[in-house]
Amino acid sequence: MTAAPAMSWWQVIVLAAAQGLTEFLPVSSSGHLAIVSRIFFSGDAGASFTAVSQLGTEAAVVIYFARDIVRILSAWLHGLVVKAHRNTDYRLGWYVIIGTIPICILGLFFKDDIRSGVRNLWVVVTALVVFSGVIALAEYVGRQSRHIERLTWRDAVVVGIAQTLALVPGVSRSGSTISAGLFLGLDRELAARFGFLLAIPAVFASGLFSLPDAFHPVTEGMSATGPQLLVATLIAFVLGLTAVAWLLRFLVRHNMYWFVGYRVLVGTGMLVLLATGTVAAT
């Protein structure tokens, strides 16, 4: 197999910035990495670099939700021993576990397809445009009348299944989980928060699993050195922390249509570039 091309520092910085800025927004960070790397660097950053740089944004969401995580974990552990402590946070701990199962199973069995075939830009930009309709529909029909006390294990299953759609670059993890939450009648901020909590174990496992491949990719994609991966992770962390804080404030007063418009604009523009041969799909 031909050795993967090495990444320059400029590529690392740009792609890590794209990762950090878009990871928590419903616009697909993996899709943006594929688009940016193809347009500006004539190559694909690869699924492995994407997964490892996600460790930076993973750290960001863990820091942001640290108090929630400690509270939920504490309640879950106490609830396992004492029934009287089985409150909302105890149940939420179980919901995160339940909702994580689908993506762990699919990610394990279809990892090779995720790393290669579905990274074709035609697939990415089509998903970017098509799933915009799903987000718009969820925003339109969602009642947003249910709060955290009314969250159930069935909601966890549905949102967990929706999270598996994020395995396809261009869909968006937050876009799929927030949309699922809105379809279930959850309020917009709860849908986002639960989706972020659900992503923590999945993204962490994905990043660790892909760490060796980022140095020596087993499929198409550029390779990075240890220092480059460290810098990429730090950049993604700083920008990711800013992005998650901004998004949760934004969703309190604004709807998802802003992101729908952005996705359609970028996706349509990319379809034109692909159709005219200006940008190569692979």
Curated annotation (Swiss-Prot):
Spans traversing the lipid bilayer: 90-110, 121-141, 194-214, 228-248, 256-276
Write the signal peptide boundaries: none
Q: Which residues form a coiled coil?
A: none
Give the species: Mycobacterium tuberculosis (strain ATCC 25618 / H37Rv)
Stated EC number for the protein is 3.6.1.27
Record-level GO BP terms: cell wall organization; peptidoglycan biosynthetic process; peptidoglycan metabolic process; regulation of cell shape; response to antibiotic; response to nitrosative stress
Annotated catalysed reactions: di-trans,octa-cis-undecaprenyl diphosphate + H2O = di-trans,octa-cis-undecaprenyl phosphate + phosphate + H(+)
User: What domain of life does the UniProt record list for this protein's source?
Assistant: Bacteria
What's this chain's function? Catalyzes the dephosphorylation of undecaprenyl diphosphate (UPP). Confers resistance to bacitracin.
* The keyword Membrane is assigned to this record: yes
Entry-linked Pfam families: BacA
Q: Where in the cell is it found?
A: Cell membrane
Query: Cross-referenced InterPro entries, in alphabetical order?
Result: UppP (IPR003824)
Q: State if Transmembrane is listed as a keyword.
A: yes
Additional record remark: Bacitracin is thought to be involved in the inhibition of peptidoglycan synthesis by sequestering undecaprenyl diphosphate, thereby reducing the pool of lipid carrier available.
What membrane topology does the annotation report for this chain? Multi-pass membrane protein
Gene from which this protein is expressed = uppP
Q: Name one GO molecular function term.
A: undecaprenyl-diphosphatase activity
Q: What is this protein called?
A: Undecaprenyl-diphosphatase
GO-annotated cellular components: plasma membrane
Q: Which keywords has UniProt assigned to this entry?
A: Antibiotic resistance, Cell membrane, Cell shape, Cell wall biogenesis/degradation, Hydrolase, Membrane, Peptidoglycan synthesis, Transmembrane, Transmembrane helix
* Lineage, highest ranks first: Bacteria, Bacillati, Actinomycetota, Actinomycetes, Mycobacteriales
Q: Which HAMAP family match?
A: Undec_diphosphatase
Family as reported in the entry's similarity comment: Belongs to the UppP family.
